[in-house]
């Protein structure tokens, strides 16, 4: 009891500190809105939108009761071919049958979905006339289910209507959606907590997505028992996604420095910039990653480590789902989208694949060296959490210290030696930069603006890590 009380006090102190200081922890700023919304060029407020989440070993068995309570009569269960034969999906179906819930299974979800795979799932959802959705799988499955729910609830909309600008029209979601329950089986995306759905837009060979609080799951069931089936490299790459979600959201441009100021609350973006509440979740997720990720990768039977990483994924999701991510993710989308022949170990797919978490983390040393010029104290703080000795470090040391800490972390976990190791060369940099430019939804949240030349230099620096 005393330990729990101490933990609460510690978190409250973190919140108090974050609310009183700017992201560099050295200059105070006012929380007052100042001018009216119509008169400001930058935002003055932030929102926290989070799915209801339930955590516990075996909690998946409750899903049938949840859908019964929601009044669901016809449920769309989405998963992928591999997972459809594994215990998580069987546990879900047993619960649905036990509670008299009618359902149809869609198991054609693509790992790293595309606009084509999204539209196939959407068509299935439209024909099924479902009154609730249930996603069992990793981020690809949950994101596909979000899209199916959205477009089947808005059947006359064009696919690009809700896709993020500049690739799509980025229209706000105003139609009511059906309940969606997410049962994550990996520990990385945090998609069970966020209003974001990511996919490859095949025409341009880039990743983009849909971002709206309206599409976040109604309920996320976080069951650590599902993590025990994950292969080593899936655990690793999922964990790298958690790592970068937390690092990027904590070092993102502060919400009150983001522009433009929205003319209405409905136009305030899902990704709003770092803020005092997201900061707490990001820091806590980083501490869990530092303590448990290596254990979770190396020992598949370590339920404590894998359970904590499952929680860290949700914690980081709460943080970045409202604060946002920036350059690591913005640059990762063309890295995944332009993949040539690389096939990651432990992924049972029939197409070339750079897992999302790997594509994100390979640029992290270069990115945080670049961004450390803004808010260096934050960069030193996260380096210390990850194991660096920062007692004699100065502000100008922040970038190199964090970059070296990340390189050591990745080397210890047998991560590929940079972009060159997954099939890229300097000749590919112009296309990688071209694929990053449309990702302004996230790249504009970097604390430091970047030119095309800057992006080229970051990709070049990421060709080799060690």
Swiss-Prot record:
Keyword match Acyltransferase: no
GO molecular function: alcohol dehydrogenase (NAD+) activity; hydroxyacid-oxoacid transhydrogenase activity; metal ion binding
Top-rank taxon: Eukaryota
Enzyme class: oxidoreductase
Any one cellular-component term (Gene Ontology): mitochondrion
Modified residues (Phosphoserine): 451
Modified residues (N6-acetyllysine): 444
Record's subcellular location: Mitochondrion
A Pfam match: Fe-ADH
Alphabetical keyword list: Acetylation, Lipid metabolism, Mitochondrion, Oxidoreductase, Phosphoprotein, Transit peptide
Reactions mediated catalytically: (S)-3-hydroxybutanoate + 2-oxoglutarate = (R)-2-hydroxyglutarate + acetoacetate; 4-hydroxybutanoate + 2-oxoglutarate = (R)-2-hydroxyglutarate + succinate semialdehyde
GO BP field: glutamate catabolic process via 2-hydroxyglutarate; lipid metabolic process
EC number: 1.1.99.24
Cited InterPro entries: ADH_Fe/GldA, ADH_Fe_C, Alcohol_dehydrogenase_Fe, HOT
Family statement drawn from the similarity comment of this UniProt entry: Belongs to the iron-containing alcohol dehydrogenase family. Hydroxyacid-oxoacid transhydrogenase subfamily.
Function noted in UniProt: Catalyzes the cofactor-independent reversible oxidation of gamma-hydroxybutyrate (GHB) to succinic semialdehyde (SSA) coupled to reduction of 2-ketoglutarate (2-KG) to D-2-hydroxyglutarate (D-2-HG). L-3-hydroxybutyrate (L-3-OHB) is also a substrate for HOT when using 2-KG as hydrogen acceptor, resulting in the formation of D-2-HG.
Protein name stated in the entry: Hydroxyacid-oxoacid transhydrogenase, mitochondrial
Annotated source species: Bos taurus
Name of the gene encoding the protein in the UniProt record: ADHFE1
């Amino acid at each position: 009891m005393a330990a729990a009380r101490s933990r609460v006090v510690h978190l409250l102190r973190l919140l108090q500190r974050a609310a009183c200081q700017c992201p560099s922890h050295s200059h105070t700023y006012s929380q007052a809105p100042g001018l009216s919304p119509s008169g400001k060029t930058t935002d003055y407020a932030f929102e926290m939108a989070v799915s209801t989440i339930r955590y516990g070993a075996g909690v998946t068995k409750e899903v049938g009761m949840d859908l019964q309570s929601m009044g669901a009569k016809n449920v769309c269960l989405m998963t992928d071919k591999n997972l459809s034969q594994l215990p998580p999906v069987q546990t879900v179906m047993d619960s649905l049958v036990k509670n008299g819930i009618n359902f149809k299974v869609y198991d054609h979800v693509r790992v790293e979905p595309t606009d084509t795979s999204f539209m196939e799932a959407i068509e299935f959802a439209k024909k099924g006339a479902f009154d609730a959705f249930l996603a069992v799988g990793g981020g690809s499955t949950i994101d596909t289910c979000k899209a199916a729910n959205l477009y089947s609830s808005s059947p006359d909309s064009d696919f690009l209507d809700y896709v993020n600008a500049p690739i799509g029209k980025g229209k706000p979601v105003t139609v009511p959606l059906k309940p969606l329950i997410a049962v994550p089986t990996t520990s990385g995306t945090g998609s069970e907590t966020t209003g974001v759905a990511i996919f490859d837009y095949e025409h341009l060979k880039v990743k983009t997505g849909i971002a709206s609080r309206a599409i976040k799951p109604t309920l996320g069931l976080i069951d650590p028992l599902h993590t025990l089936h994950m292969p080593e490299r899936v655990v690793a790459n999922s964990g790298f996604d958690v790592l970068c979600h937390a690092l990027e959201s904590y070092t993102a441009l502060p919400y009150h420095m983001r522009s433009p100021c929205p003319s209405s609350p409905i136009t305030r973006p899902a990704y709003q910039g770092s803020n005092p509440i997201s900061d707490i979740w990001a820091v806590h997720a980083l501490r869990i990653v530092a303590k448990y990720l290596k254990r979770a990768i190396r020992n598949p039977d370590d339920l404590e480590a894998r359970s904590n990483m499952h929680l860290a994924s949700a914690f980081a999701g709460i943080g970045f789902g409202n604060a946002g991510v920036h350059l690591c993710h913005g640059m990762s989308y063309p890295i995944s989208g332009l993949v040539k022949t690389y096939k990651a170990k432990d992924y049972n797919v029939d197409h070339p694949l750079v897992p999302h978490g790997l594509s994100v983390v390979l640029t992290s040393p270069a990115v945080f060296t670049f961004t450390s010029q803004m808010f260096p104290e934050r960069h030193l703080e996260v380096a210390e959490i990850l194991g660096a000795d920062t007692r004699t470090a100065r502000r100008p040391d922040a970038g190199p210290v964090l970059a070296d800490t990340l390189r050591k972390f990745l080397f210890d976990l047998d991560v590929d030696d940079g972009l060159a190791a997954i099939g890229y060369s300097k000749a590919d940099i112009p296309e990688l930069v071209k694929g990053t430019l449309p990702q302004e939804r996230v790249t504009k949240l970097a604390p430091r603006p970047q030119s095309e030349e800057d992006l080229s230099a970051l990709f070049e620096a990421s060709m080799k890590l060690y």
